[in-house]
Amino acid sequence: EIGAIQPLPELAAICRDQGVSLHSDAAQAFGHIPLDSQRLGADFLSLSAHKLNGPKGIGALIYNPDLEVEPLQWGGGQERGLRPGTLPVPLIIGFAKAAELALSDLASRSQRLKGLRNQLWEGLKQRQPTLLLNGHATARLPHNLNITIPGVSGSKLHRALRSRVACSSGSACSRGEPSHVLMA
């Protein structure tokens, strides 16, 4: 939500020591920073195509093959028996192409986006010194800038900026409630 890069290998080690599986929502990270599921140590990583400019409605779950995973729905043998239903082939192909494009120039694009993000942050901070950066200053995704502007209504600011800037005043799944991440 705020672009913070968590110390997954360390968290995974703690979980393993306690006999707990670890899931990480890697949708924001996939295609923007290197992701090696084995090095990260998470038992489950979820990905989403639309975060890569791919089609909406398709994602992937990478999971540790050593774990026994029980299906939530029963039916056909699709997706290794974990989820029944007809596979959405056009969405799968769109996801694969979006991933291929994102991964083909990941390092250079990440560096460029990081530079643009930092330039935007510095420019905003010079004009409005009371701005607050949400999350870690450096351990963050290159394409995400999450800020708080004290005393300014997020919805009013969003309405004023939305025709010129890709922005939001909350998460897509927030239902108008303040973010529990930002409130913590």
PLM features per residue range, with description:
Residues 1-184:
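Pyridoxal 5′-phosphate
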